[in-house]
A protein has these predicted regions:
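C-terminal hydrophobic structural anchor segments
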Residues: 90-121
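A short loop-to-beta-strand structural motif that recurs across blades of beta-propeller domains
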Residues: 38-41, 80-82, 128-131
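A short beta-strand motif characteristic of beta-propeller blades
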Residues: 2-8, 49-57, 90-100, 137-143
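Repeated scaffold domains used in trafficking and secretory/extracellular systems
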Residues: 11-19, 59-69, 101-109, 145-155
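Short, solvent-exposed loop/turn segments at conserved positions within beta-propeller repeat blades
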Residues: 31-38, 123-127
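Blade-level signature of beta-propeller repeat domains, shared across WD40, Kelch, NHL, RCC1
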Residues: 129-155
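Conserved beta-propeller blade signature
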Residues: 23-26, 72-76, 114-118
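Structural recognition of the beta-propeller blade-terminating site
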Residues: 44, 85-88, 133-134
Length: 155
């Protein structure tokens, strides 16, 4: 095995998804000490080039990138749940799901029923609460889970 090509995308990549056009989306948390802003980056895997690089405002810490079933809308955590249709060129300033006083720690998209799963770690000691929402952010229900639940796998 050998490296055939590379591309600098910034520091602290925290999520990766592939869209309906086979483009690679990477969420980079950035790096405060070196003044690198967090970014959402779209890479063309054929040309190995960055097609979109969208910076987040200072002080933001986006993470937990996932994509919907039709692979045309990304979701991520950033003190709330945000969506990003891949056809857009700018980030939304408002979350579809507000975090409030909760401690969102995990995010997933269930392609079987098109629902968003968000884990509230509460205080890192109690059992987490999993909240389930529609893609537009309408609350459906919540269920209890283990301590600091952070990932979701759907068959």
């Amino acid at each position: 095995n050998s490296i055939t090509d590379s591309l600098f995308i910034g520091k602290n990549a925290s999520g990766i998804s592939i869209d309906k056009n086979s483009k690679i989306w990477i969420l980079s948390k950035g790096d405060v000490p070196s003044s690198q802003a967090p970014k959402l980056i779209c890479i063309n895997p054929i040309t190995v080039s960055i097609e979109k690089s969208i910076s987040f405002a200072g002080g933001q810490t986006p993470w937990r990138l996932c994509i919907n079933k039709t692979k045309d809308t990304l979701f991520y955590l950033n003190n709330g749940v945000y969506n990003f249709p891949i056809s857009q060129s700018s980030l939304s300033s408002s979350p579809i799901i507000s975090q409030g006083s909760k401690l969102y720690y995990g995010l997933g998209y269930n392609p079987n029923d098109n629902t968003i799963y968000v884990s509230d770690a509460i205080d890192y000691v109690q059992k987490s609460k999993i909240e389930i929402y529609t893609p537009d952010g309408t609350f459906i229900k919540s269920v209890n889970a283990g301590i600091i639940s952070n990932s979701f796998i759907f068959d």
